[in-house]
Curated annotation (Swiss-Prot):
Protein's UniProt name: Large ribosomal subunit protein uL18
Protein origin, superkingdom: Bacteria
Annotated SUPFAM superfamilies: Translational machinery components
Native species: Janthinobacterium sp. (strain Marseille) (Minibacterium massiliensis)
Spans through the membrane: none
Family of the protein in this entry: Belongs to the universal ribosomal protein uL18 family.
């Protein structure tokens, strides 16, 4: 079993437990260059999302080095997804790190979302 398959296996276990609880989840996906965060409902509908590909996020990151593959960009994405979720009336979610370690950019998304008012 290689590294990617192990990550996907861990992600499946997390998603199965969250599906059993029937709560909204904050799903995070990370690539080398970008980070994506989505609030997904129990019926698998996307209720709010944010990523480093959004024009507003890219404008805020324009003065910094890198395009979005850093902790500062991840924190900005976490803050934006929390703001969108609160605007949609979602205050509480389960954190789905998709098998990624809770470290670096994934941790930055979670902490920024908590600071912006989202409860895990």
């Amino acid at each position: 079993m290689d590294k990617k398959q192990s990550r996907l296996r861990r992600g499946r276990q997390t998603r199965a437990k969250i599906a059993e609880l029937k709560v909204n989840r904050l799903a995070v996906h990370r690539t080398n260059l970008h980070i994506y965060a989505s609030i997904i409902g129990p019926d698998a509908t996307v209720l709010a999302s944010a990523s480093t590909l959004e024009a507003e996020v890219r404008q805020e990151l324009a003065g910094q080095s890198g395009k979005g593959g850093n902790v500062a960009a991840a924190a900005l994405v976490g803050k934006r997804v929390a703001e969108k979720a609160l605007k949609a009336g979602i205050a509480e979610v389960a954190f789905d790190r998709s098998g990624f370690r809770y470290h670096g950019r994934v941790k930055a998304v979670a902490e920024a979302a908590r600071e912006a008012g989202l409860k895990f």
